[in-house]
Curated annotation (Swiss-Prot):
It is found in: Cell inner membrane. It catalyses: GTP + H2O = GDP + phosphate + H(+). SUPFAM superfamilies: EF-G C-terminal domain-like, P-loop containing nucleoside triphosphate hydrolases, Translation proteins. HAMAP family: LepA (MF_00071). This is Elongation factor 4. Pfam families: EFG_C, GTP_EFTU, LepA_C. Its EC number is 3.6.5.n1. The lineage of its organism: Bacteria, Pseudomonadati, Pseudomonadota, Gammaproteobacteria, Cellvibrionales.
Length: 599
């Protein structure tokens, strides 16, 4: 199928739970991509975690052939995208390979902030956006209201939005027909020198690096000698093909097509995402504009429970970074936890998922320290340093000013929950920037400290709005704030992994609740364990985990009191000696207790 006019590259934009993966299943079924026996729910969510949590994390691609009502056969290249706010960079990568996007909106729930953000990304990249109303067979569906919401909030014409139900398969053919009519065919010269963009890469234990590519011009065949523009190393192509969703070798990919390429690259960083592939003979071909590098928002220390796992842990992180370009890591050592890595993530969900993938796919046992954001610190001599780890904060005497990152949060919610959401934003030290009433919905714009947003703001927003509010946020600037480091001392020793950077106004309260939390989590020892929270040299809170003690006077029946006193004194002296040499084991829960401190 060499005719470019018969190729359509598209992706689906939707909020979590609006039926994106189910719609993809129906497309595959309708176009006969898999036999009825191989078909299963959420075919494209290939990771166990994706299935269990019901979310899409990685972008996947499928090539289907569809015979339209007019009898023409079209090749549909469909790239699945995630919907959660933490994975928005995956979306922008997928969209770069498409000419069109389906904006899927739940006809019962209406438009949500995340789909608005992704939709604007698509429009900025010049894609044709087609609104689709899903779940119209639900009794509570209101397609007219939702169509007018799409027009009010996003500003694209939704009068003739396609209506379908991905679950029952109703209207799927209409969606495909509109897709063929509205999405432009790709442009590209098959005879020009090869130019292909790497959308995604992952590591296969047998094949090495497998890359998902979009060919913009020329064609890519097996046995071709190729180079990657940023690295310049030549490789020979072993395998070229498409996913139907199973891997299918075709031997050739032409301009406008999306498929995979395997070139026997064994180095983990051998095929960076966003790089350009070309033939070794035409190495002067210009590099395609890649993707903007995403900056991690949340940093946490990850440490293997047993130090023997350190090497495996490093390899596992390398393989994950190939598959997930936004993960950042560098080696770190902690007095309390030994050697590990400081990792950067896009948000809390991203962090949980990376930890879960490391534990499942690579069989590691990990301890995570409390996540922090990155702070800008100006020292007295005028130099500026960035701190992503509280224990690396310079001495308070040398600091002229500390600045915390501020994000702009866009929230959409029904009017009934406006009051509760505003109260939550004020608690989180937010500043209101804008408020608009759009039909039955309200769009709120707030500036909030990132530290307040990334930890538990999303969960709290969902609970105060009974799940109806949605959130999208992006970093705006660093702003000066009164920040201090809160240290936790256990038996007068600082535990570096438990340090926190907090706002001065809430430091005392946080210190007290953190010390109380620790008291619950640290098991009782044979001696008293003093837990203190301190700012600099000033202790702001203290609790004690009382010692377990044996009843040494149980064997004394009656008799002289001095005998009992002697035994009690002896026990006391023993405990004192024990306290000098005894070490307190801190359980994993205690490191994460920092998260549970209600601010």
């Amino acid at each position: 199928m060499t005719d470019l006019s018969h190729i359509r590259n598209f992706s689906i934009i939707a909020h979590i739970d609006h039926g994106k993966s189910t719609l993809a299943d129906r497309f595959i079924q309708h176009c006969g991509g898999l036999s009825a026996r191989e078909m299963e729910a959420q075919v494209l969510d290939s990771m166990d975690i994706e299935r269990e949590r019901g979310i899409t994390i990685k972008a996947q691609s499928v090539t289907l052939s569809y015979t339209s009502k007019s009898g023409k056969v079209y090749q549909l290249n469909f790239i699945d995208t995630p919907g959660h706010v933490d994975f928005s960079y995956e979306v922008s990568r997928s969209l770069a390979a498409c000419e069109g996007a389906l904006l899927v909106v739940d006809a019962a729930q209406g438009v949500e902030a995340q789909s608005v953000a992704n939709c604007y990304t698509a429009l900025d990249q010049g894609l044709e956006v087609i609104p689709v109303l899903n779940k119209i067979d639900l009794p509570q569906a209101e397609p007219e209201r939702v169509a007018s919401e799409i027009e009010d909030i996003i500003g694209i014409d939704a009068t003739d939005a396609v209506r379908c139900s991905a679950k029952s398969g109703l209207g799927i053919e209409d969606v495909l027909e509109v897709l063929i009519k509205s999405v432009p065919a790709p442009v590209g010269d098959i005879d020009a020198p090869l130019q292909a963009l790497i959308i995604d890469s992952w590591f296969d234990n047998y094949l090495g690096v497998v890359s998902l590519v979009r060919v913009t011009q020329g064609c890519l065949k097996t046995k071709d000698k190729i180079i990657l523009k940023s690295l310049g190393k030549p490789h020979v192509v072993d395998m070229v093909g498409v996913f139907t969703p199973k891997r299918k070798e075709t031997g050739i990919l032409k301009a406008g097509e999306v498929g995979f390429v395997v070139a026997g690259i064994k180095e983990i960083l051998g095929a960076p995402v966003g790089d350009t592939i070309t033939h070794a003979s035409t190495s002067t071909v210009p590099q395609l504009p890649g993707f903007k590098k995403v900056k991690p928002q949340v940093y946490a220390g990850l440490f293997p429970v047993s130090s023997d796992d350190y090497e495996n842990f490093r390899d596992a992180l390398g393989k994950l970074t190939l598959n997930d370009a936004s993960l950042f890591y560098e080696p770190e050592s902690s007095e309390a936890l030994g050697f590990g890595f400081r990792c950067g993530f896009l948000g809390m969900l991203h962090m949980e998922i990376i930890q879960e993938r490391l534990e499942r796919e690579y069989d590691l046992d990990l301890i995570t320290t409390a996540p922090t954001v990155i702070y800008e610190v100006e020292k007295n001599d005028g130099s500026v340093v960035y701190v992503d780890n509280p224990s690396k904060l310079p001495d308070l005497g040398t600091i002229a000013e500390m600045r915390e990152p501020i994000v702009e949060a866009n929230m959409l919610m029904p009017q009934a929950y406006l009051g509760a959401v505003i109260t939550l934003c004020i608690e989180k030290r937010g500043v209101q920037k804008d408020m608009q009433y759009l039909g039955g919905q309200v769009a709120l714009k707030y500036e909030l400290p990132m530290a307040e947003v990334v930890l538990d703001f999303f969960d709290k927003l969902k609970s105060v709005s009974r799940g109806f509010a949605s959130l999208d946020y992006n970093f705006v600037r660093f702003e000066a704030a009164k920040l201090v480091r809160l240290d936790v001392l256990i038996n007068s020793e600082k535990v570096d992994a438990l340090a926190l950077i907090v706002h001065r106004d809430t430091a005392q309260y946080k210190g007290r609740s953190l010390a109380d939390k620790m008291k619950e989590l640290i098991p009782r020892q044979m001696f008293d364990v003093a837990i203190q929270a301190a700012i600099g040299g000033q202790v702001v809170a203290r609790t004690t985990v009382k010692a377990l003690r044996k009843n040494v006077i149980a064997k004394c029946y009656g008799g002289d009191v001095s005998r009992k006193k002697k035994l009690l004194e002896k026990q006391k002296a023993g405990k004192k000696r024990m306290k000098q040499v005894g070490r307190v084991e801190i359980p994993q829960e205690a490191f994460l207790a920092v998260l549970k401190v209600d601010s």
